[in-house]
């Protein structure tokens, strides 16, 4: 908890692999806030679509799927999120390469996205939250108290993703991962009002070559200012 002052609503946006989820989780833990991983919510729906054989291009079926699906985030011991899909723990499975390949298109479906945004706004209403995603500061929480744009070079993001995948037991090729991230960047920057965008009021933090603890301390300094 904070020192008796109003608890903040903190928005973190940025491209895939920039480290925002890791940083957001730690910042939330340090502040005693709730961490909301919006990307995990979309990944859970993408996973269910894959299981049911629903193409990422079938917007109507995906929207219906969202209406019939329960995605729940629970606080994990490390301050992160435990992701439940219709009551099943899918925290690890949603990070698979197969899910990563379709989640950007799945998350672009308007009705699906709006349903999850309503849930996310409700979770943030009381304050004391750190939420990360692509359009948090611009659309989901436009009145957030602090807005951060977390970025890193494409090469750095690809290296991190490869390391993560290999640590989880997946095979990963650096060139293929870099191409996949570049493709996701292009998709994420062309989603209309939900596009990934660096806002004029956002505090930009480039994590290239920086340790996680350095980035966390930089963000906390901004959060503690009056």
From Swiss-Prot:
Name of the protein in its database record: Cytidylate kinase
GO molecular function terms attached to this record: ATP binding; CMP kinase activity; dCMP kinase activity
Keyword Phosphoprotein: no
Membership in a protein family: Belongs to the cytidylate kinase family. Type 1 subfamily.
Species the sequence originates in: Symbiobacterium thermophilum (strain DSM 24528 / JCM 14929 / IAM 14863 / T)
UniProt GO BP: pyrimidine nucleotide metabolic process
Keywords from the named record: ATP-binding, Cytoplasm, Kinase, Nucleotide-binding, Transferase
Subcellular compartments: Cytoplasm
Catalytic activity: CMP + ATP = CDP + ADP; dCMP + ATP = dCDP + ADP
EC number: 2.7.4.25
UniProt cross-references to NCBIfam families, sorted A to Z: cmk (TIGR00017)
């Amino acid at each position: 908890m904070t020192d008796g002052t109003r608890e903040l609503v903190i928005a973190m946006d940025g491209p895939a692999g920039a480290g925002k989820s890791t940083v957001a989780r730690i910042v939330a833990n340090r502040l005693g806030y709730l961490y909301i991983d919006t990307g995990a919510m979309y990944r859970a729906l993408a996973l269910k679509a894959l299981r049911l054989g629903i193409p990422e291009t079938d917007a109507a079926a995906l929207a219906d799927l969202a209406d019939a699906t329960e995605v729940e985030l629970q606080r994990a011991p490390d301050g992160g999120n435990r992701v439940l899909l219709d009551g099943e723990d899918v925290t690890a499975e949603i990070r698979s390469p197969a899910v990563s390949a379709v989640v950007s298109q799945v998350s672009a479906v308007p009705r699906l996205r709006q349903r999850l945004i309503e849930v996310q706004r409700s979770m943030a209403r009381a304050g004391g939250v750190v939420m990360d995603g692509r359009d948090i500061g611009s659309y989901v929480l436009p009145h957030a108290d602090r807005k951060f744009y977390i970025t890193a070079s494409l090469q750095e993001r690809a290296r991190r993703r490869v390391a993560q995948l290999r640590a989880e037991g997946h095979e990963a090729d650096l060139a293929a991962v870099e191409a996949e991230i570049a493709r996701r960047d292009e998709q994420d920057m062309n989603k209309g009002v939900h596009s990934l965008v660096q806002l004029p009021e956002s505090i930009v933090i480039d994590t290239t070559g920086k340790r996680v603890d350095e980035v966390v301390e930089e963000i906390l300094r901004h959060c503690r200012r009056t």
